[in-house]
Amino acid sequence: FSWTKNVHLPEGKFYGSAIYASKVNLTPSTPIYNEDGTYASGYRENNGYNPILEAEVNDYYARTVRAMGTAKIAYNVWDNLKVSSVFTVDYSLTKDFFFQSPDGRDGATYQGRGRMQMTDRIRYTSQNNLTYSKTFGKHSVSAVTAFEVMKYDYEDLYAAKKTYGQDINTSLGNAADPIDADQKLQEDALMS
């Protein structure tokens, strides 16, 4: 069993992200803060994006819960005949959330924008064997019959909203206008 939470910046997703573009465009002499302590903006480099402001007012995180388990049972039917079965489960639930604050450049156009994506995956596998093995002096006879069953379920749920109120609660329920919502379901099964 594992549970993780990653807090991250939107690196690697958009070329125009403030953090990525800052690596390329801003110089060490570009001010991050104004003399009064507020965040500086309006400079020509990087279209006025301030990477420290964006990192502070925006919220990006991913949570993952994962559980895996295996059980095995074996039974000797007769002296030379054995039945065995192995059952495994692999389950994961991932929730990705990002919030672009109306105080930052990315969220200002939307008066704040939030997106959440939840992905639910579960895989079951069952391996079943019937084994016969007999030795006659210097000779042996063995036979195995087996089958495996696998089932995989996948569900992805996505929603995005915009127009957050003055009291910033980053929950999607606090935004007024839906942007998009989608759901994807997939089921696969295999027997061999």
Q: Locations of the language-model features?
A:
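Surface-exposed loop/interface segments of Gram-negative outer-membrane beta-barrel transport/assembly proteins
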Residues: F1-R66, V86-M191
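Outer-membrane beta-barrel strand-turn architecture
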Residues: Y75-L81, K134-G137
